[in-house]
From Swiss-Prot:
GO biological process entries: tetrahydrofolate metabolic process
GO molecular function annotations of the record: metal ion binding; sarcosine oxidase activity
Residues that hold Zn(2+) according to the record: C6, C9, H59, C63
Name under which the protein is recorded: Sarcosine oxidase subunit delta
InterPro entries named in the record: SoxD, SoxD_sf
The encoding gene: soxD
Major place of residence: cytoplasm
């Protein structure tokens, strides 16, 4: 079992949360003007880097609010959580990522 820190409710079991994709991706100003290729790129083409990644999560089994998290994709460790609409926090990674 892993605990995820909800910025509204505190630490909760991972089974209460649902993943929502990459965070800080700008929604197209007018999606109706996009070609199918452009729309599919917006929907499906995301970075898949190893290391710290900004993600969207929803506390579906609790407050039902969306929030963002910085998670290490190599270790699955959550490094920071912050409310939707807040800027991405800076992480102090001097001396390693742990």
């Amino acid at each position: 079992m892993m605990l995820i820190e909800c910025p509204n409710c505190g630490p909760r079991n991972e089974t209460e949360f649902s993943y929502g994709g990459q965070a800080h991706v700008a929604y197209p100003e007018d999606p109706n003007t996009l070609s199918d290729k452009e729309w599919s790129r917006y929907l499906f083409y995301r970075g898949n880097s190893k290391g710290i990644f900004a993600e969207r999560w929803v506390h579906s089994g609790g407050c039902r609010k969306w929030f963002n998290a910085l998670r290490d994709t190599a270790t699955y460790e959550f490094k920071a959580v912050y409310r939707a609409g807040e800027p991405r926090p800076e992480l102090n990674t001097q001396g390693g990522s742990r």
